[in-house]
């Protein structure tokens, strides 16, 4: 395991790796406002033990990557997709299997459209298609209105987690406890959730960010890619896996089925009991479907 700072335009991105660099590369793209440590070390090692060179990185404005005032230095999903490619360049990787979670699933769709030559395969989980306006859906759900796209909007557990995240926490212990409570809500009751495990991971994330207690927030200011870009996904030819978490409160079923339907090469898998979180109870089945997909794409 080693660390590397890579340039992407005028920002620097922190990254690290697991496994043998001689193995096929797999890039992990985390969700919004989360650093690379949103991918637990234990999960990354499980993928590496399956024969992959696993690379993860801090998005700009998270962790140890460049952090600036978003209003003064705005960016969009095009830049975030270019960041992912810059990480591959920084590790000397021509093509990689790319796995995107939540906002990372949106980023990986943009990678598939704008940087398709860098992909060996594509995996997306806990996310939706480029034609889904999640921001508008959240607002409509909060007003008690149906979504305009006909798919279910974010569920009450997400709204509960959002309200919790907006509550102040005094001191490190309170901040860790708040984060653990958030993840317990988002994970749901379908799989075991270990508070102590998540507390340990959040302690790591805080240390990784230099002891800063406030969670990053810049990505809340992002504008989603134009919904019209979803039509371009019909041209994607890279082997694609879409993973639906059975109890995802942010992108509930059938969002995964809808996303898979946008890409001719996509197939759909479901992780029973899983919510919008990565407790160790889902690491085994999740790694199993990802490894099977990357091997079939080799």
UniProtKB/Swiss-Prot annotation:
Superkingdom per UniProt: Bacteria
Every AB hydrolase-1 domain range: 24-277
Parts forming coiled coils: none
InterPro entries in UniProt: AB_hydrolase, AB_hydrolase_1, AB_hydrolase_fold
Entry's Gene Ontology molecular function annotations: aclacinomycin T methylesterase activity; triacylglycerol lipase activity
EC identifiers of the protein: 3.1.1.95
Enzyme class: hydrolase
Short name of one Pfam family: Abhydrolase_1
Record-linked SUPFAM superfamilies: alpha/beta-Hydrolases
Pathway of action: Antibiotic biosynthesis; aclacinomycin biosynthesis
Activity dependence on pH, as recorded: Optimum pH is 7.5.
Residues of the active site: 102, 248, 276
Signal peptide: none
Reaction(s) catalysed (UniProt annotation): aclacinomycin T + H2O = 15-demethylaclacinomycin T + methanol
Activity over temperature: Optimum temperature is 37 degrees Celsius. The activity at 30 and 45 degrees Celsius is 58% and 87% of the optimal activity, respectively. Exceptionally high temperature stability.
Entry keyword annotation includes Zinc: no
Similarity comment text for this entry: Belongs to the AB hydrolase superfamily. Hydrolase RdmC family.
Protein task: Involved in the biosynthesis of the anthracycline aclacinomycin which is an aromatic polyketide antibiotic that exhibits high cytotoxicity and is widely applied in the chemotherapy of a variety of cancers.
Subunit and interaction comment: Monomer.
Protein name per its UniProtKB record: Aclacinomycin methylesterase RdmC
Organism, scientific name: Streptomyces purpurascens
């Amino acid at each position: 395991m080693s660390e590397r700072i890579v340039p992407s335009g005028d920002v620097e991105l922190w990254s690290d790796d697991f496994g043998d660099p001689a193995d096929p590369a797999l890039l992990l793209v985390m969700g919004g406002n989360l650093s690379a440590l949103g991918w637990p070390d234990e999960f990354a090692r499980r993928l590496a033990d399956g024969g992959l060179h696993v690379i993860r990185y801090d998005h700009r404005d998270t962790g140890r990557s460049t952090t600036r005032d978003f209003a003064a230095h705005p960016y969009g999903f095009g830049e975030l997709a270019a960041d992912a490619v810059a990480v591959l360049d920084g590790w000397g990787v021509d093509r990689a299997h790319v796995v995107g979670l939540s906002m990372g699933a949106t980023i990986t769709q943009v990678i598939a459209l704008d940087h398709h030559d860098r992909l060996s395969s594509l995996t997306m989980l806990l996310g939706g298609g480029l034609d889904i306006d999640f921001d508008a859906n959240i607002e409509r759900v909060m007003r008690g209105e149906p979504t305009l796209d006909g798919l279910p909007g974010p569920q009450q557990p997400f709204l509960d987690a959002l309200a919790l995240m907006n509550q102040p926490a005094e001191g490190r212990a309170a901040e860790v406890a708040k984060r653990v409570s958030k993840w317990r809500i988002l994970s749901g009751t379908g799989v075991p959730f270990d508070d102590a495990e998540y507390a340990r991971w959040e302690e790591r994330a805080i240390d990784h960010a230099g002891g800063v207690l406030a969670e990053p927030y810049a990505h809340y200011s992002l504008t989603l890619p134009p919904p019209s870009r979803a039509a371009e996904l019909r041209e994607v030819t890279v082997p694609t896996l879409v993973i639906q978490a059975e109890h995802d409160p942010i992108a509930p079923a059938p969002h995964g089925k809808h996303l898979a339907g946008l890409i001719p090469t996509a197939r759909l898998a479901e992780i029973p009991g899983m919510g919008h979180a990565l407790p160790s109870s889902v690491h085994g089945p999740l790694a199993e479907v990802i490894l099977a997909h990357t091997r079939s794409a080799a």
